Amino acid sequence: ARATRTIAETCNGIIACLWEYYVSYQPGFPEKTAFIPLPIDLRKVTSRVRCVPEKLNFFIGIQSARSNLKGTDVMLPVLQEVQRKHPDLCRITEVHDVPYARYQQLMDDADVQLDQLYSYTPSMNSLLAMAKGVTVVGGGEPENYEILNETELRPIINVLPDEQDIYKKLEEIVLHKERIPELSAQSVAYVAK
């Protein structure tokens, strides 16, 4: 904490790429804190708006050393419970500790990605998923849209760090998979902005 404060005090500017960082630094350093969203080069991403899938493909990437930080340790068992209840409507692509290039490749066939349970905003993995047209379940709080001045698009299925809320939102998208094309299109548009 002391090193962070020293760096913040002595640097010329603080670029916050997520809402969480902005609200952490802006009160103490308002004159030097600026919000600049994470950049996604859409020329390097193949975007594909998803159709209504016959069987919804959920994607969850797990880094064993960080599972409790990202919330996948909470989301995976809930997702598995939804899949057990609706085996004909959804499936799970679960990947563990794979290199990033392979992770991105495996995500290409997903309809929905689960990531960042404890975040208010999507981070790099979620933004790349959205750029591909994959719907994200994770952090999508109102503050995320407000800092971007986004008043129309709401592509992220926001979940609270609560198993009942996660279950409800996952089951809802399984039972209403006709929403996937709209959420997919909004995801691509959100990243393009």
Predicted feature locations:
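A conserved nucleotide-sugar
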Residues: 58, 76-104
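Conserved donor-binding/catalytic core segment of Leloir-type glycosyltransferases
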Residues: 36, 40, 44-70, 76
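Membrane-proximal helix-turn-helix segments that form the acceptor-binding/catalytic region
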Residues: 1-14
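Short hydrophobic beta-strand element within catalytic cores of glycosyltransferases
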Residues: 135-142
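A short, well-ordered alpha-helix in the C-terminal region of glycosyltransferases
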Residues: 172, 179-192
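Short alpha-helical segment that forms part of, or immediately flanks, the ligand-binding pocket
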Residues: 104, 126-131, 145-146
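Acidic donor-binding loop of glycosyltransferase active sites
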Residues: 108-121, 134
